[in-house]
Amino acid sequence: MVHWQLMDREGSLALLHEYTKNESLIKHALAVESCMRAYARKLDSAHEETWGLVGLLHDFDYDQFPTQDEHPYVGEKILEDRGYPPEFRRAIMSHAEYTGVVRETPMEKALFACDELAGFLTACALVKPNKSIFEVEAASVIKKMKDKAFARSVNRDDIRNGAAALGVELADHVSFCIQAMQGAAGSLGLKGVT
């Protein structure tokens, strides 16, 4: 068994790729990781790596186990078997409302706040002329949230409630995550096509 503290990003990325083959899901994991690392630097800088890896692995089981009966329960068991600690696994469990795991820590609240928003920001970037996260602005994102036909699978209430649970204004949360994703634009495929 590999102790979680010895699992670096490379090992966690390998775990993601072991269970996730869908390129969009991999990019989503990287997007959430970038947002989580940014929030860790702001709220809990001593644990940036943990926050980042929670973001990276929050949906690693979803590609193979997509039902509410399976995800994130199967992933939590895999992480337990790999030696990840309870607080790491609990954060991942808490991002899915239907698990009933109440979000208590800043890391758990940040994961919930970043998950749906990262997907929505990706969708906003992909409809821009250059398909670039650098073209996305908070005001246009908030306006797009009102268009229920756009990125319809993204839960807007989760985005709003996530920001509120973190104690930040929605516009500030959106801007913060845009900046975080800009820092990872190359790996997200959102650097632009110019």
Where are each of the predicted segments found?
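Predominant activation on well-ordered alpha-helical scaffold segments within soluble catalytic domains
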Residues: 13, 17, 30-33, 37, ...
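Conserved active-site and cofactor/substrate-binding residues in soluble primary-metabolism enzymes
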Residues: 7, 11, 27-31, 70, ...
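C-terminal binding/interaction regions
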Residues: 20, 133, 139-193
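Acidic/His-rich, divalent-metal-binding segments that scaffold phosphate/diphosphate chemistry
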Residues: 1-67
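Divalent metal-dependent catalytic cores for phosphoryl transfer on phosphate-bearing substrates
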Residues: 46-148, 160
